[in-house]
Amino acid sequence: MVSYYLMILVGAVLVNNFVLSRFLGCCPFLGVSKKIETALGMSGAVVFVMTVAAAVTWCLDHWLLAPNGLGYIHTLAFILVIAALVQFIDIAMKRFVPPLHAALGIFLPLITTNCAVLGAAEINCRQGTGFCESVFFSFAAAVGFGFALVIFSGIREKLAHANPPRCFRGIALALVTGGLLSLAFMGFSGLVKLPY
């Protein structure tokens, strides 16, 4: 049992990383990765939202939508659940951590439309896994998102002191760096075989 959950963790963080393998959540990956502090704050917010959203959306889908034949509106219901969770985090951060709230800026409310969060809920719905597996997979996927975001922001902080050619400055260098990071993570492919 423990080895199965360890496989889910390794698979979601390294092998099938949401950002670097599935290309989900690229907007905050590029937008919040200029400083490690903001990347850590965004990672924490995404871990919380994705984990709680997985629990709530699993219950919603299995206890309300599927039994009543309302599966066709599950995406809309999932978006509403995610939006409510993001509002909760936004209010809590504004109250308790104002500097981090200001640093994240517009990207915090954009977690609502972060396709990684919605993607995790959709994957859990389609795979038909149990409650604990779904929540743990979403937690591991969020940790993988945060892991990639922090690594990428560390690289971008170092590159801020470099003097690249003019055509590579800004987002161009960030995209090339993200592509190289994605290639590096391809080295983990085949490490774990998961149904996700």
Regions found by a protein language model. Give the residues of each.
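Ordered, amphipathic secondary-structure segments that act as subunit-interaction surfaces
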Residues: 62-105
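Structural signature of hydrophobic alpha-helical transmembrane segments
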Residues: 4-19, 69-84, 136-148
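Juxtamembrane transmembrane-helix termini in multi-pass membrane transport proteins
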Residues: 10-43
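Interfacial loop-to-transmembrane junctions
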Residues: 157-176
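Small-residue-rich segments of transmembrane alpha-helices in multi-pass membrane proteins
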Residues: 45-55, 105-120, 170-182
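Generic transmembrane alpha-helix signature in multi-pass membrane proteins
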Residues: 23-31, 90-96, 107-108, 115-128
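Juxtamembrane boundary at the C-terminal end of a transmembrane helix
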Residues: 4, 183-196
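Mid-bilayer segments of alpha-helical transmembrane spans in multi-pass integral membrane proteins
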Residues: 80-88, 107, 111-123, 142-150
